Regions:
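Periplasmic alpha-helical coiled-coil/stalk elements that build and connect Gram-negative outer-membrane
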Residues: 30, 54, 142-257, 371
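Sec/SRP-type N-terminal targeting helices
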Residues: 43-47, 60-61, 113-140, 190, ...
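Short segments within alpha-helical structural elements
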Residues: 61, 204-226, 382-440
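Bacterial Sec-pathway N-terminal export signals of envelope proteins
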Residues: 19-68, 72, 78, 228, ...
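Bacterial Sec-dependent N-terminal signal peptides
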Residues: 1-29, 39, 427, 442-443
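Small/polar, glycine/serine/threonine/aspartate-rich low-complexity segments that form flexible
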Residues: 21-24, 70-111, 237-245, 291-324
Length: 443
């Protein structure tokens, strides 16, 4: 029995240790760092870079020597017959030339000497790599913003639950006291019913937010690249994060559109279209290739090719091929015209992107400044609403205020509390959006 108890205690002990190991305690900065290493989007983007690097090498190898080997074997089940008048008697005599079996082996090296499309293709492959790298940079920025928003949503949920629990506790006390006063005949039944309605509404809100809590944690795990049911504990508070994310200097920071990742991506898109036009133009240039072949052939009436005394006859060949496009029925000209139109469109998109990013920077600065002002106002308003509600509660129990006045004060308090919580989230989220709009790199 003692052994069984010992085993149970040991099992519980190690299970507790395992559970602790599986629980992550993370500040917002740590959550971002973790996500940039483990999120699904970042990992996929890094794979895209590796893919692009392999694509560059694949394109490069087109211009490098290409060596192929060939081995052939023939066995004439019935050899072809040739007719010839060898004895000049006027009659063709049948003859069989050659051996019944033969085998040949060869090695051929092909080398591209000049191809305009190869040069353009090599440039395009490098541009493709740059696009993949820029896409990864954008993914990193999006991941950072997603983690900030998800982390903030968890804190909002936690704070909302705490506020609702506090409100329910106070309201429950008021409801109980009002019910006792009603039993003693000092107030109306409507006062009790009014508080009961408010209490029921608060409990429903608490139940709803409590259910949303697990979803908020799962969304944070997903943004970080965790299994969605991973246990995590957030070490930052909503209030501390809000204060840390108030930076008026950020609002006055200059915006350089040429440094923005979206502008760079748009520039690369234009470069891609330019290379496509050059590719179509290069198809009108000649293509020059060279080849070198070494071979050996053996002949026999029986399969003796693996014998040491089998005679093999060597051969070698060096050659050059020149291919010159002459006439394509104006199909090439049509393709060049299409590529030119695509390049013109890319120029327009580049100008549009520049204007859009400049406007976006101004808008996000304004949104961020407004969110700071709303936060400061909401913080002041929630304190005022608490004082008003407290005064109305005292007046209500002293019999000099109605339940309607108390209800108004309570609803005003609850609204201001939620406004305050949401204003803190807005500061955090809008700062992340502004940093992305200004293309401030992740630290």
């Amino acid at each position: 029995m003692k052994k069984l108890i010992l085993v149970c205690i040991s099992t519980c002990f190690f299970a507790t240790i395992y559970a602790q190991e599986k629980t992550q305690q993370l500040s917002l900065k740590e959550a971002i760092t973790y996500a940039l290493k483990n999120s699904y989007g970042v990992k996929a983007a890094q794979n895209d870079i590796l893919l692009a690097q392999k694509k560059v090498w694949e394109t490069t190898t087109i211009g490098l020597p290409q060596i192929t080997g060939a081995l052939g074997y023939q066995n004439f089940l019935q050899q072809p017959v040739t007719l010839a008048d060898f004895d000049q008697d006027g009659t063709d005599d049948p003859f069989v030339f050659g051996t019944k079996q033969n085998m040949n082996a060869s090695v051929t090296m092909n080398q591209l000497l000049f191809d305009g499309s190869y040069i353009v293709g090599l440039q395009a492959a490098k541009t493709y790599l740059k696009i993949s790298e820029q896409a990864t940079e954008k993914t990193v920025m999006r991941t950072k913003e997603a983690v900030i928003n998800a982390y903030g949503n968890v804190l909002v949920t936690e704070n909302s639950i705490l506020v609702l629990e506090g409100n329910i506790e106070v309201l429950q006390q008021n409801y109980t006291a009002t019910k006792e006063i009603y039993k003693n005949g000092f107030n109306e039944e409507e006062d009790v019913e009014q508080l009961e309605i408010t209490l029921g509404n608060l409990k429903n809100q608490l139940n709803s937010i409590s259910r949303m809590k697990s979803i908020a944690y799962q969304m944070l795990n997903l943004a970080m690249g965790n299994e969605i049911d991973t246990k995590i504990i957030l070490t930052d508070t909503l209030d501390s994060l809000t204060k840390a994310n108030i930076s008026l200097a950020l609002i006055s920071q200059d915006f350089k559109v040429s440094n923005h990742i979206d502008f760079k991506i748009s520039e690369n898109d234009r470069e891609t279209k330019r290379l496509m036009m050059r590719l179509e133009q290069s198809k009108g240039l000649p293509t020059l290739t060279a080849f070198l072949n070494f071979g050996a052939q053996a002949n026999s009436d029986s399969f003796t090719f693996l014998n040491g005394n089998q005679r093999w006859y060597d051969s070698s060949l060096l050659g050059v091929n020149l291919s010159i496009p002459i006439f394509t029925s104006f199909g090439g000209a049509a393709k060049i015209a299409q590529a030119k139109i695509a390049l013109d469109t890319a120029d327009l998109r580049l100008i549009e992107t520049k204007q859009r990013l400049s406007l976006q920077a101004q808008k996000t600065k304004n949104d961020y400044q407004v969110s700071i002002e709303n936060y400061q106002t909401s913080k002041k308003n929630v304190h005022l609403a608490e004082r008003i509600e407290k005064k109305q509660r005292v007046k209500f129990f002293e019999g000099i205020s109605s339940s309607f006045d108390l209800l108004q004060a309570q609803n005003q308090l609850y609204t201001q509390q939620q406004n305050y919580i949401q204003s803190m989230l807005a500061v955090i989220a809008n700062k992340a959006t502004l940093e992305n709009a200004l293309n401030i790199p992740t630290k």
